[in-house]
């Protein structure tokens, strides 16, 4: 059975609001900015089935299927994934937003893999994406934050082991 592994690019919007402003005011002013981010990414990103956009209080999450970036049990980026990363880097580089790269996986790890634990491979994958964005695409390092969670903190409530489930 094949599990999905999602890479999350979370663009955190920082708003300058006074301490006297209510939470409702912040969320109301926040929503148009997230809508705009989503429009920007959708206009530049290639149209693919494995890309899901989700608006959350902390920003826009762009979830991308693991097969876009990695082979099973491996943390090296596939050459075919570089176009998607180049596009994301191009946009992130021009925005004021930070980019958090969250890696989650419950995919079976082959015995001959360099990684034995889910957290090890997910951390290495997030770091490799960040390294590519910073070293190859020149995104400022202070804007990119890689995080590996292994099997912990799955993104979707419908986590399952079926091919259509999300981790």
Residue spans of the language-model regions?
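N-terminal targeting leaders that direct proteins to extracytoplasmic destinations
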Residues: 1-58
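Short, aliphatic-rich beta-strand segments
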Residues: 60-66
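Periplasmic peptidoglycan-binding/anchoring modules of Gram-negative envelope and division proteins
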Residues: 33-47, 52, 73-103
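A broad detector of the eukaryotic-type serine/threonine protein kinase catalytic domain
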Residues: 25, 67-69
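Periplasmic OmpA-like peptidoglycan-binding domain that tethers envelope proteins to the cell wall
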Residues: 31, 56, 72-79, 92-94, ...
